[in-house]
């Protein structure tokens, strides 16, 4: 057994209280062994002046879209996708996707993210980047059948199911998978209905965009005579362990369906604001017992992957949407970014206690914007920045130490991504 002892810090407990304690983790099993007065570890990690919190979880992301950061802005979702994003994505190579994913993972890890839900293409390349970086992930192939004939549409679903089967459990269990049809309006419903039972047989959950904009909701209501999540239920898409992204335009019946079925929501406030998609009813989700996680969405619609910043956005816009300053309170948001996100992605993490996965972020409290320290839970929700994360630990392994990623050469990753981004845009624009 090889152990890591995190010493000298304060610890955020599962009850969201703070106490001074050491944390001992088993780097071989990847679990926390003890919190408190622990035995000495084989190696130590200094947390003096820091708060040890559960690793943050980004429940919905398209990490490789770092290559398109700043490429197309200030448009509503449908125009943004059809005029800008989909045409350039048609030119993506597997090498582009790996380079963009590696850049995204460096950004995530430096901001204290230990697990990510990622929907994109060329999933073996994404999984390889995940294995190299040392992060944890729930991955899937984004299935889009718009504009494809029946054979190509079916092939896209077959690819989505195949990679879910083949890659589940990769990277020593850090990679888990899901079947990921893009949405109810971009993936053929008949094929969804056909492939859902096959995904269930394979033991993988299902993740998709749902109720993101009124342009998505209204056609389903008009054509099907039911709300989108009622239609999703008819297709078999609402089962325990499944999770949706966005859930902006939902009614009470749909919220009740999510709660009854045990389906989580990846709440992406910054992307929803930037694309003017709307404000998700987060307090209503919480009141109904729906598990809520925090997501950044892709870095082309955010435009960063900072879950710390996303917590603040979620709290602020949640209060605005509810017209209630007490709504979406700091403890709710901290829980969503940690335990709620871990539950949404299906990882036994999100809490600093014995038996949980040793996925941790160590936040440096020595900053003017974190002084004084009346309430550290409040600080996590409203004042902490991603750059305040000093160390990131995944499965008892130190991945970021003193703000430097140990598993990837960040400088080389940035240079490689810059080159791939330039070449991608040049191909797409015919230069």
Curated annotation (Swiss-Prot):
CDD domains with a match to the protein in the record: ATZ_TRZ_like (cd01298)
GO molecular function: 5'-methylthioadenosine deaminase activity; metal ion binding; S-adenosylhomocysteine deaminase activity
Protein EC: 3.5.4.28, 3.5.4.31
Pfam families (UniProt xref): Amidohydro_1
Cofactor(s) the protein requires to work: Zn(2+)
Binding of Zn(2+), residues: 60, 62, 209, 297
Enzyme class label: hydrolase
Catalytic activity: S-adenosyl-L-homocysteine + H2O + H(+) = S-inosyl-L-homocysteine + NH4(+); S-methyl-5'-thioadenosine + H2O + H(+) = S-methyl-5'-thioinosine + NH4(+)
Cofactor binding summary note: Binds 1 zinc ion per subunit.
Keywords: Hydrolase, Metal-binding, Zinc
Role: Catalyzes the deamination of 5-methylthioadenosine and S-adenosyl-L-homocysteine into 5-methylthioinosine and S-inosyl-L-homocysteine, respectively. Is also able to deaminate adenosine.
HAMAP family: MTA_SAH_deamin
Protein name: 5-methylthioadenosine/S-adenosylhomocysteine deaminase
């Amino acid at each position: 057994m090889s152990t890591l002892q995190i010493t000298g810090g304060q610890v955020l407990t599962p009850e969201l209280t703070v106490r001074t304690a050491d944390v001992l983790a088993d780097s071989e099993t990847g679990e926390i062994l003890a919190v408190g007065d622990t035995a000495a570890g084989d190696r130590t990690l200094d947390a003096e002046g820091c708060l040890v919190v559960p690793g943050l979880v980004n429940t919905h992301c398209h990490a490789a879209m770092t290559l398109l950061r700043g490429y197309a802005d200030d448009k509503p979702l449908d125009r943004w996708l059809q005029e800008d994003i989909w045409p350039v994505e048609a030119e993506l190579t597997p090498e582009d996707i790996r380079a963009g994913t590696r850049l995204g993972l460096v950004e995530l890890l430096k901001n204290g993210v230990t697990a990510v839900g990622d929907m994109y293409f060329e999933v073996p390349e994404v999984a390889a980047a995940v294995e190299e970086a040392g992060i944890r992930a729930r991955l899937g192939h984004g299935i889009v059948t718009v504009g494809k004939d029946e054979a190509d549409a079916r092939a896209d679903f077959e690819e989505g199911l195949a990679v879910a089967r083949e890659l589940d459990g990769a990277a020593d269990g850090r990679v888990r998978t899901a079947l990921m049809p893009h949405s109810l309006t971009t993936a053929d419903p008949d094929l969804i209905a056909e492939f859902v039972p096959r995904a269930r047989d394979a033991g993988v959950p299902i993740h998709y965009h749902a109720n993101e904009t009124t342009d998505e909701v209204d056609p389903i209501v008009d054509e099907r005579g039911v709300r989108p999540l009622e239609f999703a239920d008819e297709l078999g898409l609402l089962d325990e362990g499944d999770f949706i992204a966005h859930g902006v335009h939902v009614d009470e019946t749909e919220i009740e369906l999510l709660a009854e079925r045990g389906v989580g929501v990846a709440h992406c406030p910054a992307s929803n604001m930037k694309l003017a998609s709307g404000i998700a009813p987060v307090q209503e989700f919480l009141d109904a017992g729906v598990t809520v996680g925090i997501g950044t969405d892709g870095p082309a619609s955010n435009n960063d992957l900072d879950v710390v910043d996303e917590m603040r956005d979620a709290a602020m816009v949640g209060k605005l949407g509810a017209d209630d300053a007490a709504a979406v309170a700091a403890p709710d948001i901290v829980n969503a970014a940690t335990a709620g996100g871990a539950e949404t992605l299906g990882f036994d993490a999100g809490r600093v206690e014995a038996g949980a996965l040793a996925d941790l972020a160590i936040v440096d409290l020595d900053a003017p914007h974190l002084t004084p320290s009346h309430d550290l839970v409040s600080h996590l929700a409203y004042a902490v920045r991603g750059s305040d994360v000093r160390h990131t630990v995944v499965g008892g392994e130190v991945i970021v130490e003193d703000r430097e990623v140990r598993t990837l050469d960040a400088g080389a990753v940035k240079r490689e991504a810059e080159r791939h981004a330039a070449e991608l845009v040049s191909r797409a624009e015919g230069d």
